[in-house]
């Protein structure tokens, strides 16, 4: 899951996959703004064929937060 997520993040935020770790924060480490994050969530929803409610997405600060959320919500 992490590798797939890294591909999507690198594409949407125009960063190198090598810069992306589980601890990377979207705003401080990866240079995303709020619009970037919205677009990233939309891309994840499309790629993973799932819906991520806005209130859940607001809690995503790090790449690890997203991996944990997706893992929890796709295993059900």
UniProtKB/Swiss-Prot annotation:
InterPro entries: ACP, ACP-like_sf, PP-bd_ACP, Ppantetheine_attach_site. One of its GO terms (cellular component) is membrane. 4'-phosphopantetheine is transferred from CoA to a specific serine of apo-ACP by AcpS. This modification is essential for activity because fatty acids are bound in thioester linkage to the sulfhydryl of the prosthetic group. Residues 1-74 form the Carrier domain. Pfam families: PP-binding (PF00550). One of its GO terms (molecular function) is acyl carrier activity. The modification O-(pantetheine 4'-phosphoryl)serine is found at residue 34. PROSITE patterns: CARRIER, PHOSPHOPANTETHEINE. It is found in: Cytoplasm. Transmembrane segments: none annotated. It comes from the Bacteria. Its main location: cytoplasm. PANTHER family: ACYL CARRIER PROTEIN, CARRIER DOMAIN-CONTAINING PROTEIN. Belongs to the acyl carrier protein (ACP) family. This is Acyl carrier protein.
